[in-house]
Amino acid sequence: MDVDHLRRLHAVDTERPGAWIRRRRRTITGEQVVLSAAVLGTLRLLLDARAERRLPHLSERLGHVVRTNSEAILGAATPKVTTDFSRGVAITSSIHPDAVTHIEPVRYGRGSNAMGLLATILVGPGRLPRPLRFAIAAATHPRTFLQSLSVRRWSERTVILLVMQSLDNSLRIMLRGNRRGPHLRSTQGHGEPNPTYLPIGHRAARLAAEAIGGVPGGSLNESILDIPITAHILGGCCIGDGPGTGVIDAYQRVFGHPGLHVCDGSAVSANLGVNPSLTITAMTERAMSLWPNRGEADPRPPLGEPYRRIAAVPPRTPAVPAGAPAALRAGSAGAV
């Protein structure tokens, strides 16, 4: 990505992903560019562009306040298929065992067994280092450990527990280089350290195992490396009132580069404690609803000026017909 400040155009270079030959490289230019490459993709692209001075005015807050949803991925599995847990909707229910914790049971479709490679035995708390506790648990329960290595019919035997919390902990993601080239690195950020052990999640996994006649399980990252794992990385391009406090404004426009917008999970600045997909969708729909129609005046204040509430802009030629269930109605287009 590059920017032509004289003509206020952004240039995006594209190529066919994964191709060794016939990459079909081309450059697309436009006055407005919406960046939505998921958190790690967006951060990598913007950090690269800032380091190479292609987007030199990006905020120094880029990569700060990256959230993991304060998550743990646990579960329970039976040695053999007694009940096919792969049948049904992926997520149908959830519980809130306390004020900050949210647990969702998750199922994978039949044949979706690759995630089982990240699963292992559950390792609880103790005074010894966690890798040593893992080794002791594997040695004292060899049959359970060996069964955890098998991914045969894993999705049919397993109930996954997605444990999420709305606590204030974060990471900072930076661009670092070595002989192999630049790569992303993370360090502890704002708030409490990211948890590698959630007692309430472990209790839920043990209760689930008891209910299905199986054994509780955790993830390799946590059990062996004492490093948390997440399915919902968020933040890094947080909203602020200026480049000193955020990367984008409340309309999700990038400070320092008019015409560039970020509309994905990197704009979410908090641990939600729930699956973030609908939040990301709602934030993006809100940002897009404030864009002017082509040829009309922009109702938003200029980039860098204080936020003010404005009414959503009705589309001139809506893609959804007026009588359709999802049509924009008068009550849904108020000031935001």
PLM regions with names:
Residues 92, 180, 220-230, 301-309:
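A glycine-rich phosphate-binding loop feature that marks nucleotide/adenosyl-phosphate handling sites
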Residues 3, 13-93, 264, 277-302:
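Glycine-rich loop(s) and the adjacent beta-strand/alpha-helix scaffold that form part
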Residues 43-45, 84-85, 172-173, 247-249, ...:
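Short helix/loop capping segments that flank catalytic or ligand/cofactor-binding pockets
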Residues 257, 271-336:
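In a subset of proteins, long, contiguous C-terminal domains/tails are tracked
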Residues 59-183, 190, 233, 255, ...:
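FAD cofactor-binding and catalytic pocket of flavoenzymes
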Residues 1, 159-162, 184-270:
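A glycine-rich dinucleotide-binding beta-alpha-beta segment and adjacent secondary-structure elements
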Residues 1-8:
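Feature captures the FAD/FMN-dependent oxidoreductase FAD-binding
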